[in-house]
Amino acid sequence: RASRNLPAILLASQLRPGFYGFLLRAGVDLPFSADHYGLSLVLGGAEVSMRELGGLYAMLANKGVWRHPRLYEGEAAGSAVPLLSPEAAVVTLRMLEDDAHFVRSKEGPVPLRFKTGTSNGFRDAWTAGVVGPYVLVVWVGNFDNTPNPLLVGGDVAAPLFTDIAQALASDAGPLDDLG
């Protein structure tokens, strides 16, 4: 699959209000000003936690409505913050879908909607996405931040993401799809 970085930069340059404000409304902690990040923000130019990243994917799965991410059942979800139209959320998830990537559940194939990433200098490899009602974020790296040329998201984090998604699909009942 070809990278979609250039269209993402073009789109971000046209957003009003900007992507920086969108991320702030989605609970992402950005310690510097919008000018500090510029358009690099759309390509991962700021550090985000796994919880923040998961919250963004959950917002897509919730048809554009963001809530503080819950890590366990029973944790308060907080108030709803509409950030995208339902149509924009569904279109975005469908852009992340690939016919070749799905898991099998008792109800049949379930598409995986995900994005991989590799940090500058090969310090982090990650995959984040949605499978049925679940949001998964997988990070692979060294806790001391040392680089490793093998830390490529599509090579090391994506297979783990797929394995976890398959385990969830095998253990769960029907995995609801986007209606």
Predicted features and spans:
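Active-site-adjacent helix/loop patches that line small-molecule binding or acyl-intermediate pockets
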Residues: 1-30, 34-62
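A penicillin-recognizing enzyme superfamily signal
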Residues: 1, 49-179
